Amino acid sequence: MCPLQIHVLHLIQGNQKNRKGKYVNMTRQLWYILPLLFLLCHCVTSERRCYFSKISKTCSHASKCLLKADCSDRNLTESPKFNESVVQIDLSNNSINVFPDLPRSLLVLDISRNPLKQFQKNAFARLQNLTTLSIVNNTYGLQPSNLTAGIFKGLTRLTYLDLRGSWNGTAYPEEVLSDLVSLNALRINGKQKGFGVLMRKIHALKRLDISGSEGDCKIDCLHAGYFQNVHGIQELNVSNCHLTNILEGTFSYITNLTHLDISYNEELSFNILRNISKDLKNTKIEVLKINKIHCTFGVGTQIYVSDLKDLQNTSLRELHANSNRLETIQSGVLMYLPKTLQHASVSDNKLTMGMYALETANLVNLKTYDMSLQFKSHDPRDIFSNCNDTRNGYIRNRRPHESEGEISVRKKLLNDQIYRWKDDQAFEVYQNTSNNNQHKLMFPFPSPFPVPLPQRLEIAYFNTSTLHYPLLKYRIGNNKIKEIYAQDNVFYDLQGPLENLEGLEILDLSNNFCTNLSTFFFDYLTGLKSVKLNHNILGFSLAKDEKGETFKNLLKLKHLEIKYNRIQVLPKKILRNLISLETLDLADNWLRKFKVDLKHIKGLRHIDLSNNQISELPPGVMRELDEIAKSSNLTVNLTGNSLLCNCENEHFLRWIVTSTIRFGFHGNDTCQTRFSKTGRVLMSQGNEFLLVLERNCRSYTAVIVLFSCVFVILLTVIVCGVVYRYRWKLRYLYYMTKGRYKGYSSLKTKSEEGDYEFDAFISYADEDRQFALHDMMKNVEREGNLKLCFHNRDFIPGFDIAVNITNAINNSRKTICVISSNYLNSYWCMYELNIGRMESIYSRNGEDVLFLVILENCSSSNIPFSVFDIIEKKSYIEYPNDTEGDIIFWRKLRDPISM
């Protein structure tokens, strides 16, 4: 963006913030803008090719804003024109061959990787404010002919100069550089010849980089006079310079040296360590980097006491010795390292276990220790690298430079270290003797096995080091360790517990082929905030923890990763006490169901269940997640699962659509359904598809149940009504059938001619027995010469009463019912009356069989409807209960019976 554009934009924004009406202050703004339009000519060209940005975000007035112009990688052949507000310009990676005319206000200039052919003598004369200049990898190279003496004379404020890959002279351009009296940092190609006396004029020089990292450095040997004229430097980088030797005294003049990097000089080897350490003991050294000073392939290397013993009285804070094929460290070396050491790195080596491991506790102020990437594979093409592995021999574990007195001191230090942990129990150490026999040496170590660590150690890297052990019960020495990275090893059994690690906050045990995680492994790791157990085989082990014992003490844990662990099922209580958990990552497992209890994890923010086999979440889990989402911005990642969108789990899709939880579905995430031609539907179309499910999955169960109930009720009412309506017929048919097919015999059987055995069956109540057995038997049976059936006399004992009644009525020509109040109140009397009715209807073809005798007057309210029906439709006779009436009564009674 052009500076004018930025300025106008600020004006408009300011006007919008302050205006109270449509045209307020418009005239004033126009008069304010017009004088600035002359800037347009200066940025017409550059605005098409450069990107401008403000250096300070707090700048509010465009005319006073300092700008940065990024014109890199624009294929420019000449520099654009810039106004004085531009103070930083990047013209790198273009095709500019003439040094441009730049604004006087310029502070920072990068014109690297351009084919600059010539510099005018006064090219930098007007850039008196310039503080930083980079001319890296100039295509044609800078020669004494085009970078002449005095060209930098006006750059009195320049503090940083980078000429790497550009200066092609055989020596350092001392005459050119000596004018830069304020120069603080110089980066230039390393030359065989050291720095001359003219460099002493640059008193401010503190940082010197002659490495070949981006430039070109070819120096065979560094000697005592190489840096004699730049003895004020504090930081020195001579890495990647093809060095083969560094002589004693090289750094002895640089008494203020704090940082030294001699890395990536593969032909140096550890032979030069003694020379370096001797020189550095008189300096202020704080950081020493000796990475890859051995070639890649070869036998393992060793560091001896004499290599580093002179460092013991220095102020060294950092020591880097990576990629040196380091296999072992002589006992006592670590004891000679200074107490000020805070960071040590020996990664990408081939360290084996040795007694030196016990000496790490002497590094009392060490905060960071990196021994990662042990036995790492390398590019086979490195076998062609030049090597200088010649190492002076040693006798009985000592260097030729090591005196007998030094050996005695080292052994005493070692013994003090071994006996530091005194205990009643003994720890056995096996040591091979010269005749290959094994002897047991007893040392007073406690059990469980002690692991000494530096007391102030905070971060330890053991990752990718081919450590092949079960983590059993260990007691860690006094420490302040907070982070342990032990991924990519073979800790196949996490048994534990690891005692005295209550302050540990981060633990990474990923990719360790671990198959077992005991329920007490984390018992003492109560301060953990982040645990990573990815790429293991813990699915079977975790599935057994039904009580949730594994993580029970991790009350402060915030981040838990268990990806790629072949987990098929997780117990409900597995996260029982993780009340502080914020992130749970279970991605890329074999989970089909997720029924873990989450209601106690109120601060949960992210759950990753991606790439499992989950079809839906249980209702209980959905309710718990919704409750958590009320107090936190919860995200649940369900991508890559076999989600179902059918009628059976319509509630799950509805929950996804309506919940406030973010699910992070991508554009191509789908769920399986039978309501789509493709068998899948995009999760992004969840709202629309939910309507499809509602339409296709509408339940008619309630309607069906309701109609079924109504139908059953109606059918029941109808059946009951029919049964009630024909109850006597059914009873009659039942007992007739029962008597016929169940072996019952009749009282008397009909004659072959169809005559009945009895002339009449007399139905009466027991209370009216006198009338029936005395009066009727005398006046009807005897005088009328008729045969009557009385139940007191003619029923066959042992048979059902109902069967006897049915048979008696069936074998009698008439049925005489003696009606009285007692008769109406008798169940069996009413039964006999109704069976008589059925007999006349169904067996006698409508013949008048039933005859009523009203023995006494009864209240109409007590007479059943069925009796009323008979009285209304059939003739009956009332008993007169007087002498004259009796004669007529008995005669009228005998007449219908005998008919």
UniProtKB/Swiss-Prot annotation:
Molecular-function GO term, any one: NAD+ nucleosidase activity, cyclic ADP-ribose generating
TIR domain span: 756-897
GO terms under biological process: innate immune response; signal transduction
Tissue: Expressed in all tissues tested. The highest expression is in the hepatopancreas, with moderate expression in the gills, and low expression in the gonads, adductor muscle, hemocytes, and mantle.
Keywords of the record: Cell membrane, Glycoprotein, Immunity, Innate immunity, Leucine-rich repeat, Membrane, NAD, Receptor, Repeat, Signal, Transmembrane, Transmembrane helix
Entry keyword annotation includes Cell inner membrane: no
LRR repeats: 83-103, 104-126, 128-150, 155-179, 181-202, 203-229, 230-253, 257-282, 313-336, 338-360, 363-386, 468-493, 501-524, 526-549, 554-577, 579-601, 602-624, 631-654
SUPFAM superfamilies: L domain-like, RNI-like, Toll/Interleukin receptor TIR domain
Induction note: Induced by lipopolysaccharide (LPS) exposure, where expression increases significantly at 3 and 6 hours post-exposure, and gradually decreases to control levels by 12 hours post-exposure. Also induced during the nucleus insertion operation used in pearl culturing, which involves the implantation of a round pearl bead and a piece of mantle tissue from a donor oyster. Expression is highest at 2 days post-insertion and gradually decreases to control levels at 5 days post-insertion, maintaining that level until the end of the experiment at 20 days.
Cytoplasmic side: 724-899
Function: May be involved in the innate immune response.
One family name in Pfam for this protein: TIR
Any one of the GO CC terms: plasma membrane
Cystines in this chain: none
Topology of this chain in the membrane: Single-pass type I membrane protein
Protein name: Toll-like receptor 4
Protein family: Belongs to the Toll-like receptor family.
TM annotation in the entry: 703-723
Span of the signal peptide: 1-46
Presence of keyword Disulfide bond: no
Residue spans, topological domain Extracellular: 47-702
Residues carrying a glycan: 25, 75, 83, 93, 129, 137, 146, 168, 237, 256, 275, 313, 388, 432, 463, 516, 633, 637, 668
Gene3D superfamilies per record: Ribonuclease Inhibitor (3.80.10.10), Toll/interleukin-1 receptor homology (TIR) domain (3.40.50.10140)
Subcellular location: Cell membrane
